[in-house]
Structures are given as C-alpha cells and as structure tokens.
Amino acid sequence: MSLTNTFSDLCKSFAPDAFAINYTLAKNPELSSHEFESVKTIGTVLEKHGMDVTYEFCNLPTAFKASAVKVDNPKGRLAILCEYDALPEVGHACGHSASGSMSVLAALTLHKMQQDGVAFNMDIDIIGTPDEEATGCKVDMCNAEVFKDYDFAIMVHLDGEET
C-alpha cells in the first residue's frame, strides 16, 4: 500500500476523534487565554492514542505540546500548530474548532504511521497555540524562541471559500 493510501486510511480511522473535538469546541467556545476545556479535550484525545502531552507549555496556561513522531538522529523537525480559541459573541466563526481538529487529525495519523512501522527522518510535534484572536500568541512563542529548533511549521486554517 502506498504512503498516500496509508495516510488516507488512517485519517479516516481518526475522523471520529477529529469530529468530536470540533463539535465539542464549537458547542463550548472559549475566548483567548481561557481555552482550559478546549486544551483538556484535545489533550485527552492525544493521550488516548498514546501521545504524551505537556500542558502549560512555555509557561502559557492553555498551551500544549506533544510529540507525534520521534526518531533517532532526526534530519529535521516539524511543528504542527493547533489553534482553538473563539471570538467574543460569534464563537468559532474563524474556524479554529475545525482547523485545530484537523491539526490533531494530522498528528494522530503520523503518530500511528510511525507505530505501524513507517520510517520517518524527522521529529514531528503538535503545538497548541492559544490566544490567537486577542494577542496572537504565536508571536509571543516566537519571541520566546519556541520555534528556533524547528525547520518549519505548518497549520491548517479555514477560509470562507467553497471548494
């Protein structure tokens, strides 16, 4: 089976977890710096699938970090960023409940691929980046050099276009 098919099949197997996160966050929107239940929801799913989660990452009460893929002698490091805060009065109109869920879906899929024997040449972490709608916490994380040891970072974000 090709890696593309393996990835696709595993994504489908983790889809119920991603949908559950999305629905829970959408029904219970938490504003910037107050995403305590959101972090618990995401962390619980990551832990359920064998990932160790560091809460209050970089001294931010609602940030987290978990290793999806860990290898000996990595040739690079990737950060998958995960947003989950909501907007006042309109909740997840910006789509962080869905985009954060998709970041978790990617991390779970890659984690399982490694468990199933797929060889990776890089470390891959998922990093929860809270407080995006108010102060843009990723800027604070950059200033704290959280990303200095990563070769690149990716994230999912929704837009208003239909596909």
Which sequence ranges carry the predicted segments?
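Buried hydrophobic packing segments
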Residues: I42, M102-L110, C137-K138
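A non-catalytic alpha/beta surface segment that caps or lines the substrate-entry region
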Residues: P29-D72
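N-terminal capping segment at the start of a domain
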Residues: S2-F36, D85
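Histidine/acidic-residue-rich, glycine-tolerant segments that coordinate divalent metal ions
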Residues: T62-A63, S67-A68, D85-A93, S97-A98, ...
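Phosphate-handling active-site elements
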Residues: T54, N73-G76, A106-D125
